[in-house]
Amino acid sequence: MGPKRQTVSLQEKKNRILNFFQETYTFYNIKELEKSIPKKCGISPMIVKDLVQQMIDEDGVISVEKCGNINIYWCFKNQTLQKLYDSSELIKKKIQEVKCDIATYKQELDKTLATGRRKKFTVGQKSYNREALLEKRKKIQDEIKKKSNSLQKIESIRWDAAKIQENKQQIRLKKVHLEKTTDNIEILIDYLYKKFFLKPEQIRKEFGIPEEFKEFTEV
């Protein structure tokens, strides 16, 4: 009896299709997709069309345009990054709206506290329930926290020019530090050889030091 075949989730199938599009950087018609995706992604050709349509209608990660009498499909990496950026901007806007709501409810709550902790009170022509307002305030705060966490996740994976440059600089500093360390090791081996007549090969073997250190390319 052969090994049990592992089930691939719907999301994993979509991820494989997305990687296929972004790695090839090419435009396709549906017949080409139904031929290439099963080979590259291990997905049944019977469901390729439905999955691609879901990624257009529901996920919005694949683009489609009618060209003559056929549809052309594509998805480039910059489109995905732009979608993440748009999502972060939308979350920022919603957070700002919620903050405005909180400020309004806080003013109403402060008025309530100033006149005593009554369960029900009136501001202008409108009546309010203190417990209901406190519950709504808590829900809004929880929503802000949730959206803020989502925004932080999105911004943490979005690389702009400044972030790329910063990471390059950090890598350069680490490379310089590594080069100094390897130079010091070579100097120490030479010192032990001259001072105590210990063979370099013996020292390297004893401490697990390679004959040559790996060279790092410039970034």
Swiss-Prot record:
One of its GO terms (biological process) is meiotic strand invasion involved in reciprocal meiotic recombination. It is found in: Nucleus. GO terms for cellular component: condensed nuclear chromosome; DNA recombinase auxiliary factor complex; nucleus. Keywords: Coiled coil, DNA recombination, DNA-binding, Meiosis, Nucleus. It holds the Pfam family LZ3wCH. Disulfide bonds: none annotated. One of its GO terms (molecular function) is double-stranded DNA binding. Transmembrane segments: none annotated. The keyword DNA-binding applies. The keyword Coiled coil applies. Residues 88-181 form a coiled coil. InterPro entries: LZ3wCH (IPR040661), Mnd1 (IPR005647), Mnd1_HTH (IPR040453). Heterodimer with HOP2. MND1-HOP2 binds preferentially to dsDNA. Required for proper homologous chromosome pairing and efficient cross-over and intragenic recombination during meiosis. Stimulates DMC1-dependent homologous strand assimilation, which is required for the resolution of meiotic double-strand breaks. Belongs to the MND1 family. This is Meiotic nuclear division protein 1. It comes from Saccharomyces cerevisiae (strain ATCC 204508 / S288c) (Baker's yeast). The gene is MND1.
